[in-house]
Curated annotation (Swiss-Prot):
InterPro entries: Cyt_P450, Cyt_P450_CS, Cyt_P450_E_grp-IV, Cyt_P450_sf. Cytochrome P450 monooxygenase; part of the gene cluster that mediates the biosynthesis of heptelidic acid (HA), a sesquiterpene lactone that acts as an inhibitor of glyceraldehyde-3-phosphatedehydrogenase (GAPDH) and a growth inhibitor of the salt-tolerant lactic acid bacteria in soy sauce brewing. This is Cytochrome P450 monooxygenase hepE. Belongs to the cytochrome P450 family. Heme binds at residue 485. Its cofactor is heme. Disruption phenotype: Abolishes the production of heptelidic acid. It comes from Aspergillus oryzae (strain ATCC 42149 / RIB 40). Keywords: Heme, Iron, Metal-binding, Monooxygenase, Oxidoreductase. Its EC number is 1.-.-.-. One of its GO terms (biological process) is secondary metabolic process. Signal peptide: none annotated. GO terms for molecular function: heme binding; iron ion binding; monooxygenase activity; oxidoreductase activity, acting on paired donors, with incorporation or reduction of molecular oxygen. The keyword Iron applies.
Length: 548
């Protein structure tokens, strides 16, 4: 909503203690007694009621007082709304947070965010303290961002809870089967690159973000939907567009007063588009699923072993059967696409831009890839052994994470931090990611160094922390703790396979006049969508494992 009350929608300084307890003070004396029936109450009962009320009031007023935290970006004295500061937050959130820690070093403070309102920003050192706190809810925060109870928003609800079928499939099938999906990813990369990057051996230019989005959509869909659907143009269009459309729809609905959202969304073009895309997704996926179910039923009736597919369609079927539950296939598949495709393609774009600006590292990467894959190709340990490539990914994510804050949560109960700060129930909070650019933590933190984490591995005890998929308060690219990105292991494999093919098969450089300028939108941090590159197919002989 446009109007913003720093004390929150439940706050009203004129309310009395009796009103807070649900008793209006507009009735007094005998009139109040008559209305409530107290005139007929035995004196002892009346005294007990009064005593109970007094005890309740004393308990409420003597409870722990919330810490009054400073607001780094408050409205001006004569501003009636927070519209101006919200607009500033949308374009300059990183600088607002930086200003907060300059004014209040090492201390929590509040900021007004355009997406969820008043938010407590915690220093990075609090990441380990709160990472697994059961009183802090990621689900409640997501409920503030999206409106998953509304038609068309269902994929944003999937994955909120630990026992959701989407999260369970990621943990129990996708991550466990990483070694089995490497070759399918490689085969699809071969086909997709011919279509998207082309086999043109002459220099030609392309929009980097666009070609990477198309590539990652193909690779992800190969694992999520299998060979039959991963090249389906209708599905690829839906899976790329839905994420953008649902975010636009949610942003529009946040401007609408809460009670009206259930009505307004029916007429909102962005929400209508989301509903349409969910329906279209079902029309693409359900016929394939029904075909598989019929095939399995036939084979089982004939006493034959049912066909097993190595994709998420199969995994969802197995998980639903084991849980004895039902699910919407289009919803869970759009959930996977929403959390995977745009974030992965964004990082691939950032990495390729970093490599183009640091071309001296490309040959060492090619040498590592050739060395690792020379003996046996895509083995189980192949991607793990590419330590320089792993370092490059982690370094690019360090300098340009997907957001400038991480671990966004809502306190479901009162919370007392180790420094004594008391945060009341309902507090929305986030941990600043600025330690990733802290000169006290990293040497030359603003400079991209692809060897940074390779070198860190040589420090005793640091090998684990140097891995791309590891999380800590020093590197919050994937979050930290219980709700750290569960799909980061798949993203790592997908990115490494894609980059192996790109680096070995293509030369690329920034197009003339291109200046890389990644974009902020509130706390989000996006790869520059305007980057153009020159690329060409390399005329080199490659081992057969690059064609399979």
């Amino acid at each position: 909503m446009d109007h913003f009350n720093l004390a929150g929608p439940e706050s009203n300084t004129s309310i009395t203690s009796l009103e807070w307890l649900g008793i209006k003070n507009s009735f007094t004396g005998s009139h109040w007694a008559h209305i409530t029936g107290l005139s007929e109450l035995h004196p002892t009962g009346f005294l007990c009621l009064i005593a109970t009320l007094i005890i309740g009031i004393v308990h409420l007023t003597r409870g722990p007082k919330p810490t009054v935290l400073p607001v780094v970006n408050p409205p001006g004295t004569f501003e009636l709304t927070a519209n101006r500061v919200k607009k500033e937050w949308l374009v300059d959130a990183r600088q607002i947070i930086r200003r907060g820690f300059e004014k209040f070093p090492g201390k929590p403070f509040n900021m007004i965010a355009a997406d969820v309102g008043l938010t407590t920003v915690l220093p990075p050192e609090y990441a380990s303290e709160i990472r697994n706190n059961p009183s802090l809810s990621f689900v409640a925060f997501m409920a503030h961002l999206f409106f998953s109870e509304l038609p068309g928003f269902e994929p944003t609800r999937e994955g909120m809870f630990d026992n959701d079928i989407g999260i369970t499939v990621v943990h129990k099938y996708l991550t466990v089967n990483l070694a089995r999906i490497t070759e399918p990813l490689s085969r699809e990369a071969t086909a997709a690159l011919k279509d998207i990057f082309t086999d043109n051996s002459e220099w030609h230019d392309a929009n980097l973000k666009a070609i990477n989005l198309a590539l990652v959509a193909r690779l992800s869909s190969r694992i999520f939907l299998g060979e039959e659907l991963c090249r389906n143009e209708e599905w690829l269009k839906i899976t790329v567009n839905y994420t953008v459309d649902v975010m636009k729809a949610a942003e529009r609905l946040r401007r609408v007063p809460g009670p009206l959202r259930r009505i307004v969304h029916w007429f909102l073009p962005e929400a209508q588009k989301c509903r349409d895309e969910v329906k279209r997704a079902g029309k693409v996926i359900r016929p394939v699923l029904e075909k598989r179910r019929r095939e399995k039923a036939t084979m089982e009736s004939e006493g034959k072993e049912a066909l097993q597919y190595n994709d998420a369609i199969e995994w969802f079927e197995q998980m639903a059967k084991s849980q004895g539950t039902s699910y919407d296939p289009e919803v869970v598949q759009l959930f996977l696409s929403t959390v995977a495709i745009h974030t992965t393609s964004d990082l691939l774009t950032v990495v390729m831009a970093d490599l183009a600006r640091n071309p001296e590292i490309i040959e060492p990467l090619r040498e590592e890839i050739s060395s690792v894959l020379r003996d046996g190709g895509w083995k189980k340990t192949s991607l793990t052994d590419m330590k320089l490539l792993d370092s490059v990914l982690k370094e690019s994510l360090r300098l340009k994470p997907i957001a400038v804050v991480s671990m966004r949560r809502v306190a479901m109960d009162h919370l007392k931090l180790s420094d004594g700060t008391f945060l009341p129930k309902g507090t929305k909070m986030a941990v600043s990611s600025h330690r990733m650019w802290d000169p006290d933590v990293y040497e030359n933190p603003e400079q991209w160094d692809g060897f940074r984490y390779v070198n860190l591995r040589e420090t005793p005890g640091q090998d684990k922390h140097a891995q791309f998929v590891s999380t800590s308060e020093r590197h919050l690219g994937f979050g930290h703790g219980k709700h750290a990105c569960p799909g980061r292991f798949f993203a790592s494999s997908e990115l490494k396979v894609a980059l192996c093919h790109i680096l070995m098969k293509y030369d690329f450089e920034l197009a003339p006049g291109t200046v890389v300028q990644h974009r902020y939108s509130g706390a989000s941090y996006y790869a520059d969508p305007a980057i153009r590159v020159m690329l060409r197919r390399r005329n080199v002989a490659l081992p057969s494992w690059f064609e399979r």
